[in-house]
Swiss-Prot record:
Its EC number is 2.7.7.-. The gene is ncs6. Pathway: tRNA modification; 5-methoxycarbonylmethyl-2-thiouridine-tRNA biosynthesis. Keywords: Cytoplasm, RNA-binding, Transferase, tRNA processing, tRNA-binding. It is found in: Cytoplasm. This is Cytoplasmic tRNA 2-thiolation protein 1.
Amino acid sequence: MPPSPCARCHDQRAVIIRPKNRQKLCRTCFLHVFETEVHETITSTSLFHPGERVAIGASGGKDSTVLAAVLKTLNERYNYGLDLCLLSIDEGIKGYRDDSLETVKRNAQQYNMPLVIVSYGDLYGWTMDQVVAQVGKKGNCTYCGVFRRQALDRGAAKLGIKHVVTGHNADDVAETVMMNLLRGDLPRLSRGTSIVTGSAASDIKRSKPLKYAYEKEIVLYAHHRQLDYFSTECIYSPEAFRGSARTLIKDLEKIRPSSILDIVKSGEDMALLKKVKSQVLGTCERCGYISSQRVCKACTLLEGLNKNRPKTAIEMEIGLEDEESSSTLRRQMEKVELGGV
């Protein structure tokens, strides 16, 4: 059987079958179509404005690496006028994050973008290796998720940046829809499906330019552009519930390729059924960070961790309930050094 021609240009030989719609494309057309679809997502939602400073949440993985490469390309091609930088979080996981950060550092040079790295150790006095040693692997993702969200916000705030973009893709959003549907949690489903998100605890805007991009196509894009990315999964991330949702979605995708986007669209429709009430923002009485509660989630988790530490080890951290401890942590948070810019 002769090779199939590209369905778009009809000149080159097709080398890719798009997972999204089974369309056969040559390398050049696939890359252009992928970039054009991301551009359409950005423009149709008015995601950016000229002159905006935007931090790309960079982990060194395929999603954030592709996001950085595509945004750089589109920023130059369509003259978005964005000031882009890379913002990475060092959770303190030896053999994983230290290696992936080396990839991010190379990306910063390859894309000519400033890089800022914020560490859990500097912000909270705990690395994830230490957290796991204390609480075990079960439930450690809760700590990491809360700490990472606040670390991204703190890093962006230190830079004077009000917009952070992340590499969440269509598969991620579909999994979130499925999990929250099974939980019966419409408010969380609404937050998870929106292309622009944030939280009651932050005035930092977060968005997902790759929201409608399939994970498989992100891998194909990275491969055909020969992007430099880190492919090892986090050693502490079992994600039992999300893993079950992922397996179900992958099985549906095999039967019906459009299933992923169908689930995303259904989630968007369901999100309209319940209006999420806005919360009143204040500041955490311990660390001074924006919070809808008297004590923010990060400080609540840190209090539990620090109860098992000797007093001498936590005098400069959260855990002491007197006023001096709270002001000490606030000063510590304010003095975090952010290099690279």
